[in-house]
Structure formats: C-alpha cells, structure tokens
C-alpha cells in the first residue's frame, strides 16, 4: 500500500519511537537517521536524506530548523514541535512557502480535549472558565540534568 514511499525518521528518542511504532503498525518500510551517530555527521549523509519523499523530524529541538531548511524542497516533512529555537529562524521559516511542512501540535488528542468535546452530553451548562497546564514533568526527573533540554546552548528556553 505504501511501497512507493521512501520514509525516513530523523532521531531515535521517545517521539521517534512512537512514530516508528505507528509506521510498523501501518506496515511501512522506513529508515532511521540518528543525528548523534558519528557516521551521520558527514555531509554526504545529509544529501542522502534528500532521496526520501517523507521525513519525520524528531531529533533534538536545536536541529529542527537545519533539517527543515535543507529538506523542504525535496520531501514532505512532519516536524515535532518546536520547529526552531530563536526568532531569526522562525522568521526564516515563515518565508518558506511550502504546503509540504507539518508541525506536531497534539493537544487536540489529549484527554481534556476529549472531555471538553463531551461536555454537552452531560448537560452541565456553559463552560465559564478553564485553565489547563500541560506538561510531562521532565524537569522533575532524575535524568533531566543529562538531557539535551537542560543544555542552554541546545534548548535556550528550556522545556
């Protein structure tokens, strides 16, 4: 069914594993490009990414802009949020006129969103106010200090 697609997943962390699992469930062939691997730092390997027609970017945040900038002309791109870490790169992304770039914004699949959709079922009346704080509490976990999100040069705004 998807045999004509050349799919690549950039990154091999938690979000990448979720995407890989979905691709396996859909019986899609794909390759994983691991940016931290020494062999993948070579420029010719980045050129090889241009051969794929679908690319999922789930690498560390500070790499997203670079991959988008290099690959958007060649592939459909699905990028985990955020697409960049600074205003200059954001301005440059806004200049790209492509209908082939998509960004993950998955709050619409959260349980609270589903509950809000069902509010009419219970005839509770109008929702007057709602304050939702959503996160994964990485800053509270033991491995946060070793995570790339705690490094100011890679994630200037933190998590």
Residue ranges and their predicted role:
Residues 52-55, 74, 124-127:
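Local beta-strand N-terminus motif with an aromatic residue
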Residues 7, 29-31, 77, 101, ...:
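Hydrophobic anchor at the start of a short beta-strand
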Residues 1-40:
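N-terminal Rossmann-like dinucleotide-binding module
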Residues 110-159:
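Predominantly a Rossmann-like dinucleotide-binding segment in NAD(P)-dependent oxidoreductases
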């Amino acid at each position: 069914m998807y045999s004509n697609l050349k799919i690549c997943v950039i990154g091999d962390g938690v979000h990448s594993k979720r995407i890989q699992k979905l691709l396996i469930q859909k019986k899609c062939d794909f390759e994983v490009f691991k940016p931290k691997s020494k062999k993948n730092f070579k420029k010719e390997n980045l050129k090889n990414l241009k051969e794929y027609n679908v690319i999922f970017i789930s690498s560390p945040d500070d790499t997203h802009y670079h991959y988008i900038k290099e690959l958007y002309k060649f592939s459909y791109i699905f990028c985990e949020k955020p697409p960049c870490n600074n205003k200059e790169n954001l301005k440059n992304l806004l200049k790209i006129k492509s209908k082939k770039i998509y960004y993950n914004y998955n709050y619409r699949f959260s349980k609270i969103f589903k509950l809000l959709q069902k509010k009419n079922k219970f005839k509770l009346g109008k929702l007057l106010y709602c304050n939702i704080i959503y996160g994964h509490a990485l800053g509270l976990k033991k491995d946060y200090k070793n995570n790339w999100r705690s490094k100011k040069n890679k994630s200037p705004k933190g998590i």
